[in-house]
A protein has these predicted regions:
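Basic/aromatic-rich interaction segments and small domains that mediate binding to polyanionic partners
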Residues: 2-77
């Protein structure tokens, strides 16, 4: 399977698992400007490459990258 199709399938799965309004808690983030572990937030949308765009409760808006970052789902929509 080519990389584009793999990313497309992953993004579709993430869009189903984490619809807008889903609450998540960050465990760890692989980013130099990471949101602190334990921060909670609300999913705004999942883009076409599978990044989960968040509104964090601390005011940040940094997206999660599911294959690199660790987080847990708190609520379903």
């Amino acid at each position: 399977m080519n990389e584009f199709l793999r990313l497309e399938r992953e993004a579709k799965r993430y869009k189903e698992q984490y619809p807008k309004g889903t609450r998540l808690e960050l465990i760890s983030m692989e980013d130099p400007q990471a949101v602190p572990p334990g921060t909670r937030g609300t999913v705004q949308f999942v883009d076409d490459v599978g990044s989960i765009h968040m509104n964090w409760d601390n005011g940040r808006t940094l997206a999660l990258v599911p294959k690199e970052d660790s987080f847990r789902k708190l609520t379903d929509v």
